[in-house]
A protein has these predicted regions:
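Formylglycine-dependent sulfatase
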Residues: 2-4, 10-12, 21-454, 458, ...
Length: 499
């Protein structure tokens, strides 16, 4: 005989059954996706094989792209670390926080009218996600306050991160490098547990720390900022990895760079495998990009530092994919970065977007939109979430940059605004004006004193070889007016003698 269970009993049992199978009725937090941002240090647009590097392969990073979407018009909001990281974490132009170059010693910061640290009262992506039920952790380079002589600064936990493990340019629990001057300075600041290691071990240690954090999060979704110190110079690879590249190139600096890049790729692969083994990969948004272009630092790459027996072209390692300029430059090579997003349950595999212009400060509102939470309305960043799901967006608003104002400095006749106290590329041709604006296909570079106009059509001339400023004066005026108006709205005033 078959017995029928009355409908009211079925309905009464439903909540119990839901709990038994692991679902929480009315609790949407269970279904919130996890978020991992991998923010590499000093990686150029063309450093990974899925963005054109033909010298070595980066199979694990490439796998992110083949399982997700890559963007060819992604920009960071500065060609140097501190302001680039401020934009990513706050969704705003870094100049709003008086951070327009790298945070250094208190004396250098004062000379450049720079803040010593990011104001901890500002909204960050970490604080927003934390307030919406996420476990939040930062692992790796910080550089938004702390290090050198700056010990009395806010901890990363004051910006919304429940757990942090940083490097020498931060305070709190941190990893310091053996035989490193900045690490030695940091060790004297106190304020946290210190772990010492070789630099080549750092990415592995950061990932181990992030995975341990993920394992302790309970039933919360997680947000992880993973910020390796790789591939920033000096390149100090594991000797065993270096052996693989000795025969690949006779440039000793490239050998070391390739070894560091290979180890970074292996560690990214280990992270992805670990997420997969934990059953987390399908519902985790993974973002991969870099903070600025590849280095061109004279202190490392000059003729005196080459081995006497070396014969060949003198150039630093790192590739811009054909774009002009490098780190510390507002030309494309300094600010256009490789960008990949993977979300297995939502993003079509092997997608590419060459239409949408997306910046690092757009990630804050876009991520919030993707995971279904509200974001602050006072952000400069724009919600570009549709583009990440395969629907290209035509930009309606321009994007603007400033690198390293020095309001106390002077104007050099015929040259760029003096940016004393900040760094410039060794190659003088990469020294750009200190302001830039992109609107559609057009990009204007100009100094704050209105000298050095350079106008490029990036659709026709992505390498910025043909300056059209003399023949397109109407476009120059339109973009110049916009970028100067924007610059005047920032808290650091332009000196009256150059307005």
């Amino acid at each position: 005989m078959k017995y029928k269970i009355p409908l009211f009993i079925n309905l009464a049992l439903f909540p119990i059954l839901a709990v038994m199978i692991g679902c929480k009725v009315g609790d949407s937090k269970v279904f919130k996706p996890n978020v991992v941002i991998i923010f590499i240090d000093d990686m150029g647009y063309g450093d990974i094989s899925c963005f054109g590097d033909e010298t070595i392969e980066t199979p694990n990073i490439d796998a992110l792209a083949s399982n997700g979407i890559k963007f060819t018009n992604f920009y960071v909001n500065s060609p140097i670390c501190s302001p680039s990281r401020v934009a990513l974490n706050t969704g705003t132009y870094p100049m709003r926080h008086r951070i327009h170059s790298y945070i250094a010693s208190s004396k250098k910061n004062k000379n450049r009218v720079m803040a010593n640290y990011l104001d901890p009262t500002v909204n960050t992506i970490a604080s927003t996600l934390r307030d919406n039920g996420y476990a939040t952790g930062h692992f790796g380079k910080w550089h938004m306050g702390g290090g050198r002589d700056l010990g009395n600064v806010p901890l990363p936990t004051e910006y919304g991160f429940e757990k942090s493990f940083v490097s020498f340019e931060g305070v709190g629990d941190r990893l310091l490098f053996l035989n490193d001057n900045l690490s030695n300075q940091s060790s004297k600041l106190g304020r946290g547990k210190i772990v010492w290691a070789e630099k080549y071990e750092s990415t592995r240690i950061y990932i181990d720390s992030a995975l341990a954090f993920i394992d302790r999060k309970g039933d919360k979704p997680f947000f992880v900022n993973l910020c390796p110190n790789d591939v920033h110079d000096p390149h100090l690879p594991d000797s065993k990895v270096l052996e693989e590249f000795v025969s690949l190139t006779n440039n000793p600096w490239e050998q070391k760079f390739f070894a560091v890049l290979r180890d970074l790729d292996n560690q990214i692969g280990r992270l992805i495998d670990s997420l997969n083994k934990r059953g987390l990969l399908d519902n985790t948004i993974i973002i991969f990009t870099s903070d600025n272009g590849p280095t061109d630092w004279g202190k490392y790459y000059n003729i005196d530092n080459y081995p006497k027996a070396y014969e060949g072209e003198l150039y630093p390692p790192g590739f811009t994919g054909g774009f002009f300029g490098r780190k510390w430059s507002l030309y494309e090579g300094g600010i256009r970065m490789p960008f990949i997003m993977r979300w297995d349950s939502k993003i079509p595999k092997s997608s590419m977007d060459s239409t949408s212009i997306v910046t690092a400060m757009d990630l804050f509102p876009s991520i919030c939109s993707l995971i279904g939470i509200e974001y602050p309305k006072n952000l400069d960043g724009i919600d570009k979430s549709k583009s990440f799901l395969g629907v290209p967006i035509v930009n309606k608003f321009p994007v603007m940059w400033e690198y390293s104002s020095n309001p106390g400095g002077s104007i050099k006749p015929g040259g760029s605004w003096n940016i004393g106290g900040s760094l410039k590329p060794k190659n003088r041709s990469f020294h750009s004006p200190n302001l830039a604006i992109r609107n559609g296909d057009w990009k204007l570079l100009i100094n704050t004193d209105l000298t050095g106009e350079m106008l490029y059509n990036l659709n026709n001339d992505p390498g910025e070889k043909i300056n059209l400023a003399d023949t397109e004066q109407e476009i120059v005026k339109e973009l110049k007016d916009k970028v100067i108006e924007w610059r005047k709205s920032m808290p650091v005033e332009i000196p009256k003698n150059i307005q």
